[in-house]
Amino acid sequence: MKKILRFASALLCGAMLLCSLSVTAFAENDDEVYDFDPNTDKIYSEAVYMVNTDTGDVVYKKNESKKMYPASTTKIMTCIIALEHLSEGALSKKVEVPYDCFNDFYEDPNYSDPSNAAIEPLQDNLTYKDCLYALMLPSACEAANILAYNIGGGSITKFIGMMNEKAKELGCTGTNFVNAHGLHNDNRPIPATGC
């Protein structure tokens, strides 16, 4: 489980970097290393906070305190919390799929298509593993809510509290999760230094 958690944490860091920085490099062999130079390489992202994970040194920062919306990177934190609270044996257990897991985005006219996972309310054959796979699909918001509902003991709000506690534990500053899926919420921008 610790390997999975380390992998998920690395995935979170990688996703934050990918969302923050677009750098393309081609290596002819595995020994080649791309040297990023912020003085000569074009940075397309509006905000960046890049850290060398081996040394903890800040490699590059741009608008690091500017509040940005994290969108689907939120689902990576949802995945981390889920993996921390589920044993390998639990992955095959079925989950409850109540209407509560769908209401917050289908009742809001701002969310035109919050799902690509084709999960239906009251579906009775869905497992934790299915939800974790669906979670990584674009806009599979109901999968995030289903995980939050089930792991939070029937309370999505309780799960969101777990996400915020984990963010603090990881040293994320200025981070405040208000949902498990990352759909837009005016109360939720975080700075690039947030994670």
Predicted regions and their residues:
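Active-site-adjacent loops and short helices of periplasmic peptidoglycan-processing enzymes
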Residues: A27-T193
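Gram-positive cell-envelope targeting signals
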Residues: M1-D31
